[in-house]
Amino acid sequence: MGSLCSRNKHYSQADDEENTQTAEIERRIEQETKADKHIQKLLLLGAGDSGKSTIFKQIKLLFQTGFDEAELKNYIPVIHANVYQTIKILHDGSKELAQNELEASKYLLSAENKEIGEKLSEIGGRLDYPRLTKDLVQDIEALWKDPAIQETLLRGNELQVPDCAHYFMENLERFSDIHYIPTKEDVLFARIRTTGVVEIQFSPVGENKKSGEVYRLFDVGGQRNERRKWIHLFEGVTAVIFCAAISEYDQTLFEDERKNRMMETKELFEWVLKQPCFEKTSFMLFLNKFDIFEQKVLKVPLNTCEWFKDYQSVSTGKQEIEHAYEFVKKKFEESYFQCTAPDRVDRVFKIYRTTALDQKLVKKTFKLVDETLRRRNLFEAGLL
């Protein structure tokens, strides 16, 4: 009898402990659910090479702890790969231009650089790249300085030459140092294609401050074959941040060289706007790469792009840059309102001029985004 009572007491204690654990788990789930309700979900979208991932890295630097030494070191093979890929594009481009252009001679490499070019092109085509050494840097510098490569660089918009080509070539010696650790700037310039989905949680004014919203930002692959992975992220989004590289109006897609990048961006922007799940979602349009745009637009006519064929130049210098920018901005505004029902006054739409590599500008822009979204939340709560 005593043993039965003892056993019942044991079972009772076990049940109590299990009930306590269950209650604790339920309490935690409830807390996490409540906490999640206060986290604003932001979706970072845009075509490939729009600068989305650079914006994402800036957020990590600005509003989180940045990159620790281990993370920085992980970028060494990425940066070395970028160097090899860049010099390969330029070398192969010069060969192609030398075969097909009327002024073929200016794209012909000097005799001493032909062999170097073939060697570097072979390295750039590998799946695994060697670490940069002083000898390889010497070869890359010799090829980079060849007049044929510099002429080819002027045709970079036709050849998928990355925007950061100059930066890589100016820092070769530092990249090849045996003790090299990438700087924050190196990481921002490093190019690695986003595949799948990456996320980060942050607050533009610090998570512990009552006045600040907490955001969860999702960056997704921009190439066409990556876009199907966006679908499951569409529900419950507070805002879409859409990046458009306005400097790429004369360039073609990496994955389809028949397609103009700006036309692809326009079509993607309009497709996203028409998605039913974004009916009430705020849109923040980042007209990105303005630093490149302001240099290019004075040399390459904006009406090179089919979408901008009605553009007419009115001035020179700064006035022309501003006129061209306002024209592009208006085109995106027209697209937005054409794709948005007239009664959708509850959907916020803002346009920001951005340069993803400019940390101060990115910080200022996200403060403005934060302010806009907080005002919208207060309005929806009836407090404004």
From Swiss-Prot:
The keyword Cell inner membrane does not apply. Residues 284-291 are annotated as: G4 motif. GTP binds at residues 49-54, 163, 188, 194, 222, 288-289, 291, 356. It holds the Pfam family G-alpha. GO terms for cellular component: cytoplasm; heterotrimeric G-protein complex. The keyword Nucleotide-binding applies. Residues 215-224 are annotated as: G3 motif. Its cofactor is Mg(2+). A lipid is attached at residue 5 (S-palmitoyl cysteine). Guanine nucleotide-binding proteins (G proteins) are involved as modulators or transducers in various transmembrane signaling systems. GO terms for biological process: adenylate cyclase-modulating G protein-coupled receptor signaling pathway. Residues 186-194 are annotated as: G2 motif. The lineage of its organism: Eukaryota, Viridiplantae, Streptophyta, Embryophyta, Tracheophyta. One of its GO terms (molecular function) is GTP binding. G proteins are composed of 3 units; alpha, beta and gamma. The alpha chain contains the guanine nucleotide binding site. Residues 354-359 are annotated as: G5 motif. Keywords: GTP-binding, Hydrolase, Lipoprotein, Magnesium, Metal-binding, Myristate, Nucleotide-binding, Palmitate, Transducer. Residues 38-384 form the G-alpha domain. A lipid is attached at residue 2 (N-myristoyl glycine). This is Guanine nucleotide-binding protein alpha-1 subunit. The gene is GPA1. Residues 1-22 are annotated as: Disordered. Belongs to the G-alpha family. SMART domains: G_alpha (SM00275). The helical domain (69-189) is required for self-activation.
